[in-house]
Regions:
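Long, repeat-rich segments with strong aromatic
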Residues: 60-63, 67-89, 98-110
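A structural signal for well-ordered alpha-helical segments within the folded catalytic domains
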Residues: 2-5, 9, 47, 51-54, ...
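Conserved catalytic-core motifs characterized by acidic clusters
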Residues: 23-31, 94, 156-160
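CBM-like carbohydrate-recognition segments
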Residues: 91-92, 98-184
């Protein structure tokens, strides 16, 4: 855990925006902005981050000296993400510019849903703050499943927000959906 913690803290200190309380994908995005003039925070990237922190917490012993640090970051990131959820329950490819990417993006929605439900199931988030957002997100995910079982609205592999359509899918999106299902 010591090595993981050392590397995570370096990454957190470097890529976490203390104002927006979100993670940049990498340092090439520090000075980039979206069409609306806001910073670029990739939905799936922040989904990976909060899901990863949930997995760190799953691995840490209850009495770990590291637990409070990761619980604090988890709660802060969850609260930021909840505020950015759209009215239907989805998150978008660009967290701060959903108008440029109006379609729901299911890989980030699934990763965030997994983390929110993990937080609820483990007492890290309250019912009042996270239950409704988690259920709304789960419903969006279920509605994104085609009749043939394909999960739609998954942004293809990439490194930044891109437009997504109902017919786009990828295995990592399905994996994120299944991960969320493990906490339901």
């Amino acid at each position: 855990f010591e090595f993981m913690d050392k590397e995570f803290r370096k990454t957190y200190d470097y890529l976490f925006d203390k104002t927006e309380k979100l993670f940049y994908r990498d340092d090439s995005y520090f000075n980039k902005t979206e069409a609306n003039g806001k910073k670029v925070f990739w939905g799936r990237g922040n989904g990976w981050a909060i899901a990863g922190i949930a997995n760190i917490l799953k691995s840490l012993p209850a009495n770990s000296e590291y637990r409070n640090y990761y619980e604090s970051i988890f709660r802060s990131l969850a609260q930021s993400l909840i505020k950015l959820q759209d009215g239907k329950g989805a998150w978008h490819a660009s967290l701060l510019d959903p108008d440029s990417y109006p379609a729901p993006e299911t890989s980030c929605t699934a990763l965030i849903t997994y983390a929110l439900i993990y937080g609820l199931n483990n007492g890290l988030l309250t019912q009042q703050e996270a239950y409704e957002p988690a259920i709304k997100a789960w419903n969006v995910l279920c509605e994104a499943i085609h009749e043939n079982g394909k999960l739609g609205w998954v942004q293809p592999s990439g490194q930044d927000p891109k437009k997504v359509t109902k017919d786009m899918t990828a295995t990592f999106g399905v994996g994120a959906f299944l991960l969320a299902a493990t906490e339901m």
